[in-house]
Swiss-Prot record:
Transmembrane segments: 74-94, 104-124, 531-551
Keywords linked to the UniProt accession: Endoplasmic reticulum, Membrane, Transmembrane, Transmembrane helix
Organism lineage string: Eukaryota, Fungi, Dikarya, Ascomycota, Taphrinomycotina
UniProt keyword annotation of Transmembrane present: yes
Topology of this chain in the membrane: Multi-pass membrane protein
Species of provenance: Schizosaccharomyces pombe (strain 972 / ATCC 24843)
Coiled-coil residue spans: none
Protein name, entry field: Uncharacterized protein C4D7.07c
Superkingdom in the source lineage: Eukaryota
Subcellular location: Endoplasmic reticulum membrane
Keyword Transmembrane helix annotated: yes
């Protein structure tokens, strides 16, 4: 029955083909056979009759062609639909047979069809997805925004907030009062001096004698180290701040003697001097002193510290240097004795609010020769300084110093601190995958099967795990692995995990870090290769390395561009220590730390 149907359909197809051949021959004959009668009629007698005959012939030809094409298209549509139905019927019969008679055969056939897909690991499926994504990204005339933000800049206020968030909450170190008692006592003395000056203005010399002759600091055993000529400028600076501020406060009018109208408070200037002196001895690394200065003197003084060295702690005490202060006080006493001797007509301890200023001025300007080697030159030099744009000059100097230190902190100090504060994006749990297109040597098929069934395998995906047991070893002198992150980011640091025990000959000599770019996407880097060298990392026991963006030969003309560039794929190339046929390289987790492109620094 089926054979007769097929024969009938083939006969119909043969008849249709014969009809088409006959129709084509008729059309060809009408076009090619010369019709002399019509030619003569059309040439010699161009009458409406000849034009009518020609139009009838053309209409018949077009009608025959359209009918033939319509019949032919209907025939092929019905024919292919019939073939599709027969194929579906045959497949259904085979499946029905397998289900009824051979269930095991059906299961094996199903597994055979889908085994290749099941054997592909997760990274392989992700690579397939990214392959099509990259193919679409490379389509011309596709708008892709550039990854460079030229307008990005580091502002001082953002740096201050960053500094405050990093070091502003370490309150656990402020209870170590034993190590900061000298500084507390000095603070108490200066505060008492300031209060006394507010209430009863007296001479600077009397203030020094009153506090330092009482020997309030003698009960503390202070640690003094390496007092030599190099320290003397710092000591003089410290003493100058104290005397200048006392002199300034004592000569303000009584109505202005409150903290709001004092250009620079006695405490703040003294603490600035303490900071400059302590910086020479690395005292600012002690968290106790940092906490004390931040609590008692405000954020502005605390920000003056050497913040790039805050990662260490040194147990040293502040040097109060009472003997040198006593000598200065004695010199001040001698100077005042000279002043009083030349002004014996006035009572020094009388109405101090009215007589003290004239006595000091007479001592400065009338008896400058007598007090030349003591305090006269110092008072005369600082008088105009404090009365001419004092606030503006000090604030400019303060902001300039703070901006430089915070800028230095942002660039260099993070590498000396724990990278745990920065998230690690090169982890499998956060979406990082290995791009096998830029990875060599390629993994073996047996390792892929072992990894799929949960067995120990030598795959580069081990680098996406922080476990010390996860490593990727190869008998090569050079290996390369590419890590694709789940989002673009600004890279700031990388961390290398290597065991500190065992044979270190398996460790690489150095690791080169590249950023993978697309020439179509990034117009600024269009004249370079796809791989941009970010850093060359020497492998050592140090687990932290800061990527130096400013030491790149390719960006020597515009070094600031690369710092603003973000990357989504990073390539690591490791070189063996032993360049031989038996050399082996073992890589462990390589952490990529930084900021996402939508985060603010």
């Amino acid at each position: 029955m089926m054979s007769r149907k097929r024969q009938a359909s083939s006969n119909d197809f043969f008849d249709m083909e014969q009809l088409l051949i006959a129709n084509d021959a008729l059309v060809h004959q009408n076009h090619s056979t010369p019709n002399h009668a019509s030619d003569e009629l059309s040439v010699n007698d161009p009458s409406p009759l000849s034009r009518g005959l020609q139009s009838d012939v053309n209409s018949n030809i077009s009608r025959n062609i359209s009918n033939t094409f319509f019949k032919k298209s209907i025939f092929f549509f019905v024919y292919y639909c019939k073939q599709a139905l027969e194929f579906i019927s045959t497949v259904f019969s085979i499946i029905k047979f397998l289900l009824n008679r051979r269930k095991v055969s059906f299961l094996l056939s199903f597994l055979l069809l889908f085994s290749l897909f099941l054997l592909i690991p997760n990274d392989g499926r992700v690579n397939i997805k990214f392959f099509y994504k990259d193919f679409v990204d490379r389509i011309p005339f596709r708008f892709i925004p550039s990854n460079f933000n030229i307008s990005f800049g580091k502002h001082l206020e953002q740096a201050k907030s960053l500094f405050k968030s990093k070091f502003g909450n370490s309150s656990s170190t402020y209870n170590e009062r034993d190590s900061i008692m000298p500084l507390l006592k000095l603070q108490s003395n200066l505060t008492e001096a300031k209060t006394l000056l507010y209430q009863n203005p007296i001479s600077p010399e009397d203030v020094l004698l009153h506090f330092w002759d009482r020997n309030l600091m003698s009960t503390y055993d202070l640690k003094i180290q390496d007092i030599n000529d190099s320290v003397n400028p710092l000591l003089n600076t410290y003493l100058d701040f104290i005397e200048k501020d006392i002199y300034l406060v004592s000569h303000l009018p009584v109505s202005e003697k409150h903290p709001g109208n004092i250009p620079i408070s006695l405490v703040n200037k003294s603490v600035q001097a303490i900071c400059s002196f302590a910086e020479h001895y690395n005292l600012l690394r002690n968290p106790s002193y940092r906490g004390f200065l931040r609590i008692n003197n405000g954020e502005s003084i605390f920000n003056l510290l050497c913040i790039e060295d805050l990662h260490e702690s040194v147990n040293l005490d502040i040097l109060c240097l009472k003997d040198i202060l006593r000598n200065i006080a004695q010199s001040s006493k001698e100077a005042m004795y000279i002043v009083k001797r030349h002004n014996s007509s006035q009572s020094f301890y009388g109405n101090r609010s009215t007589t003290n200023f004239s006595i000091i001025n007479s001592g400065l300007y009338l008896k400058k020769d007598a007090a030349k080697n003591l305090l006269a030159k110092q008072f005369d030099a600082t008088y105009s300084y404090y009365h001419k744009d004092l606030e503006e000059s000090v604030h400019q100097k303060l902001n300039s110093n703070l901006e430089k230190r915070v800028e230095k902190y942002i660039k260099h100090s993070c590498s000396q601190r724990n990278v745990a504060d920065h998230p690690d994006f090169a982890l499998k749990v956060v979406g990082a995958v290995v791009d096998y297109g830029w990875t060599f040597p390629k993994p073996k098929f047996s390792d892929i099967l072992r990894d799929y069934w949960g067995k120990k395998a030598n795959l580069p995906t081990a680098l996406l795990d922080t476990s010390i047991n996860s490593n990727w070893c190869n008998y090569e002198d050079t290996v390369q692995v590419s890590v694709r992150l789940n989002r673009p980011m600004y890279v700031r640091h990388i961390s290398l995990i290597f065991p500190i025990h065992g044979d270190d000959s398996y460790f690489p000599r150095e690791i080169q870090m590249f950023g993978l770019i697309n020439d179509i996407n990034y117009q600024i880097l269009s004249n370079m290769n796809n791989l941009v060298l970010l850093a060359t990392i020497p492998v050592s026991l140090s687990s932290v390395f800061e990527v130096n963006y400013y030491y790149l030969p390719k960006f020597s003309d515009t070094p600031g561009l690369l710092e603003e560039a973000y990357f989504n794929t990073f390539v690591f190339r490791a070189f063996s220590k032993n360049e031989s046929l038996t050399s082996q390289i073992c890589l462990y987790h390589i952490g990529i730390h930084g900021k996402e492109i939508n985060e603010e620094f």
